[in-house]
């Protein structure tokens, strides 16, 4: 697969790719140096190459020569139809053509090979996702019937999803519903932003604890847009701590302070109510200790 970019202004090749994709800086350099970047039909292998407006850039797949190392993912439930797992931070949910990281999806398929034939071929078993820097609870479909039912449940919003988020500042209201439509940012395809005419998006929050410069929130999703919690909290002036995309402050965290802490839903095949809770990961607990 290829990634296509149209240059909008005069810009260095490496900066142009970085601003239009979510590759890391080292990945951008690797793409260019391995002759995987084509500009107006010609391979460019110098990161300092100046690109003119309206130039067409094609990024080809970069094949990693490193052997994949699989991890055993923490599980909360495993049966013949579903698996409830805890995704670590700094792990993508499923592979994209532009990312060579081993995904949660690949780790799960390595442990449960039968999932390979469930759902979409490029993201088997996946019915919802968490951002790379977000940790916590996820449901994986293990059977085709469960996959279809879970997708329907997600669409009908019958799965309750709660998150813990540490944000900058102190919201004026102890509890609130953020009802603000979200669109893809026309200036940055990686980002989303609130805009009239966007897709309906609702997020509620409740303050769990206030600190001097921060607030710990219990956040609940009522829709599932890309980056929804991060976009909504930034929109009301309280971005998530450690969020390098929507925040403008540096943090000592190696990830965003956003954790999928609770899932409640009826089993897709057994109609039995299930509830799972996941404690904050150690890094987030330690950060709370430093600000208390």
Model segments located where?
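RNA pseudouridine synthases
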Residues: 1-292
């Amino acid at each position: 697969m290829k990634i296509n970019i149209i240059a909008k202004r005069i810009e260095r090749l490496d900066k142009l790719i970085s601003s239009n994709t979510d590759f890391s800086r080292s990945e951008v350099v690797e793409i260019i140096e391995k002759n995987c970047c084509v500009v107006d039909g010609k391979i460019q292998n110098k990161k300092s190459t100046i690109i003119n407006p309206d130039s067409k850039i094609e990024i080809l797949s970069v094949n990693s020569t490193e052997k994949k190392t699989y991890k055993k993912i923490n599980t909360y439930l495993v049966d013949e139809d579903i698996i409830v797992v805890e995704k670590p931070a700094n792990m993508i949910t499923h592979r994209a053509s532009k990312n060579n990281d081993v995904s949660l999806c690949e780790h799960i398929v390595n442990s449960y090979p039968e999932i390979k034939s469930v759902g979409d071929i490029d993201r088997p078993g996946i019915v919802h996702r968490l951002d790379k820097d977000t940790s916590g609870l996820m449901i994986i479909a293990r059977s085709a019937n469960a996959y279809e039912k879970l997708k329907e449940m997600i669409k009908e919003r019958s799965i309750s999803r709660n998150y813990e988020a540490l944000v900058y500042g102190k919201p004026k209201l102890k509890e609130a519903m953020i009802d603000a439509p979200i669109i893809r940012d026309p200036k940055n395809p990686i980002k989303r932003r609130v805009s009239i005419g966007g897709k309906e998006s609702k997020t509620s929050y409740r303050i769990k604890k206030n600190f001097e410069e921060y607030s710990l929130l219990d956040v609940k999703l009522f829709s599932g847009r890309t980056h929804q919690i991060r976009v909504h909290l930034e929109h009301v002036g309280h971005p998530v701590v450690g969020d390098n995309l929507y925040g403008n402050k540096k943090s000592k965290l190696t990830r965003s302070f956003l954790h999928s802490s609770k899932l409640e839903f009826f089993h897709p095949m057994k109609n039995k109510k299930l509830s799972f809770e996941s404690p904050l990961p150690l890094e987030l607990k330690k950060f709370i200790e430093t600000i208390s």
